[in-house]
Amino acid sequence: MSRRKQGKPQHLSKREFSPEPLEAILTDDEPDHGPLGAPEGDHDLLTCGQCQMNFPLGDILIFIEHKRKQCNGSLCLEKAVDKPPSPSPIEMKKASNPVEVGIQVTPEDDDCLSTSSRGICPKQEHIADKLLHWRGLSSPRSAHGALIPTPGMSAEYAPQGICKDEPSSYTCTTCKQPFTSAWFLLQHAQNTHGLRIYLESEHGSPLTPRVGIPSGLGAECPSQPPLHGIHIADNNPFNLLRIPGSVSREASGLAEGRFPPTPPLFSPPPRHHLDPHRIERLGAEEMALATHHPSAFDRVLRLNPMAMEPPAMDFSRRLRELAGNTSSPPLSPGRPSPMQRLLQPFQPGSKPPFLATPPLPPLQSAPPPSQPPVKSKSCEFCGKTFKFQSNLVVHRRSHTGEKPYKCNLCDHACTQASKLKRHMKTHMHKSSPMTVKSDDGLSTASSPEPGTSDLVGSASSALKSVVAKFKSENDPNLIPENGDEEEEEDDEEEEEEEEEEEEELTESERVDYGFGLSLEAARHHENSSRGAVVGVGDESRALPDVMQGMVLSSMQHFSEAFHQVLGEKHKRGHLAEAEGHRDTCDEDSVAGESDRIDDGTVNGRGCSPGESASGGLSKKLLLGSPSSLSPFSKRIKLEKEFDLPPAAMPNTENVYSQWLAGYAASRQLKDPFLSFGDSRQSPFASSSEHSSENGSLRFSTPPGELDGGISGRSGTGSGGSTPHISGPGPGRPSSKEGRRSDTCEYCGKVFKNCSNLTVHRRSHTGERPYKCELCNYACAQSSKLTRHMKTHGQVGKDVYKCEICKMPFSVYSTLEKHMKKWHSDRVLNNDIKTE
């Protein structure tokens, strides 16, 4: 038995049933009394909140049955009139003991009370006390232990629909003002009568729970009326205690396990005060209260609610509301749960929680997170920065002098693999019978096209070397490479790589060693010309000797194709001077199969059989595949780089002047019916000695273009080559349907447009019309001059000037090379940088 029951027995006995309120029994000399209506021993009482009947605790079942039978006793409003007036706030602070409600039931009894009856009219203080106890609180009591009667704690319940609606009215016991909502009753009690029931947050600040609340906080309250069936209004502050479910035991368990320890005391549900489904519940009193106390009403609407979801919550509508509000700073990450963040009401500057997780800084205050900037590669010697590490490695070698790429055929060494490949071209015109090697040890020929074998690729590269040797031995008038110019080009290209990313060379400038070679086409010629081998003298045997040295004679299709060329050349040799042109194939035929066999004449003059054999071999082995749809036939540019110059002839020193004259004439004529019109006519077109008998303009045929050549572009598109002798007599200009006009007259390479062909011709003629005004650099293409000019300075970049010749450079390493090349006897001064 408790100390209170032993020392101070209660006034009521087991048999004394009093219809009066329990508060009237307590006297002024008992300020520290504990729970109300607790008789001595087991005579603890249960008081009906409707009729104020007292039941012994042992008769709890009778009490429950009494409640089930819908007690129709007197209204509690009449009893509440007798209560004393409201105490002062000082008396409220003195009270420290929790007050327990008069209706005491155990959690097991909640199941029995789960089906609430209609017409129940409990006193509102019990409801408030019980609900406050769910939150770990209890109603304030006076210094004498009596419940404070001030905050209008009376309520009447409608006789019907109790499980679906709140009490029909709430009446303040002090001023008798009725309210239809408990929330407005609480506002009235706090603002009008001075009670501290809930905390008010300042404008714009989140509500924080109050730690110390006056007038007694209780942690236990065994009594609990059947409130699970009494649905409190959604705009009621007690709505935060509502838990989905129909059983009060489940509700109490959820309340103990799910509620955060320190949430706000009371707060209205979000936006429900404007819900059209609930607006009719707001009576005139409530609207008047909102008008009378606008500040309190506005503050209440800003309170953060407990994030428990009412059963009638419309999730789809709420989500649409949240999705529409996207212009806000993110919420704090310290929310109890995602569901609570989802249901959190947002102020005008807030952001939906599902859009704000994880929280991000506002856009105006900090930029969005980005990846760390890429570290620039800078040279340790001159400070120049590069985008790629590979460019820095190559540039660093210009300072260190390292030259890791060495030529296997000479003492040349360079800093880049591309330079070594370019250098290896110089060996193509020398007398080396071996295939040159690049820096990687492989053949300079690129990989063969898809569909060809490795054998073909290696054979084609070897054949290229053989033809180059054959040309160098039999063409003493071949224009040699200019070593100084080549070195200058190397320097220029290195500077361009340092200035910018390496650009793709145009099709006319790219050195492409790979070329398509069809074994089927070779076999076709092989089968069509067996036994047609004719000896043509010692010079013609020079190439077979080289082929034997290169083990090419063991490859049957190479050997027989070569002998077939010699046989055809011998049979048609006497027709060379009579024919000025040869009939060409259809213009729409495959460009990649457009090579012809040189018939041994140039400008109507005969040439040595060996020279024609070399040209015939190169053309013969490069015939397209039988199918016009093969990858070889689709190539716009023939992939062969034999760079065959015009064969040896009289007046070799006058060749280029004749070509330039013919080129100028072709620019003026632009006759579409001329096979080389529109800047593509023969370089020898202006020679008067080639006029025909009838006075018509005759164009001499470039090497490999005369009659009797084997056409690689048959009209059937089969790709098979057929010996063809021109039908029309001399003097007839080439037809519109003749040979493609974008084919090089020297090497037979086909180009996509005439501008590329024009630039390509300069590689044969040596013409360099574009000259730098600051140095002696000259080139054949305007774009190269443009790139070269960047080496002399760019807008916004530092300029380095030579102290001796005052030549500007945009890259310091270029100045170093200039000094080494032109002023090697001078010492380079470091203070030469100018802005």
From Swiss-Prot:
GO MF annotations, alphabetized: DNA-binding transcription factor activity; DNA-binding transcription factor binding; DNA-binding transcription repressor activity, RNA polymerase II-specific; protein heterodimerization activity; protein homodimerization activity; protein kinase binding; RNA polymerase II cis-regulatory region sequence-specific DNA binding; transcription coregulator activity
Pro residues bias: start-end ranges: 355-372
Entry-annotated residues carrying Phosphothreonine: T701
PANTHER family: B-CELL LYMPHOMA/LEUKEMIA 11, B-CELL LYMPHOMA_LEUKEMIA 11A
Region annotated Required for nuclear body formation and for SUMO1 recruitment, chain positions: 1-210
Listed result of changing L61A: Abolishes self-association. Reduces expression in erythroid cells
Mutagenesis or variant effect for C48F: In IDPFH; de novo mutation; loss of function in transactivation of transcription; reduces the interaction between isoform 2 and isoform 3; disrupts the nuclear paraspeckle distribution of isoform 2 and isoform 3; does not affect the interaction of isoform 2 with TBR1
Name of the protein in its database record: BCL11 transcription factor A
Cellular component terms per the entry's GO annotation: cytoplasm; cytosol; nuclear matrix; nucleoplasm; nucleus; paraspeckles; postsynapse; SWI/SNF complex
Residues that coordinate or bind Zn(2+) 2: C744, C747, H760, H764
UniProt-annotated location(s): Cytoplasm; Nucleus; Chromosome
Region (DNA-binding): 737-835
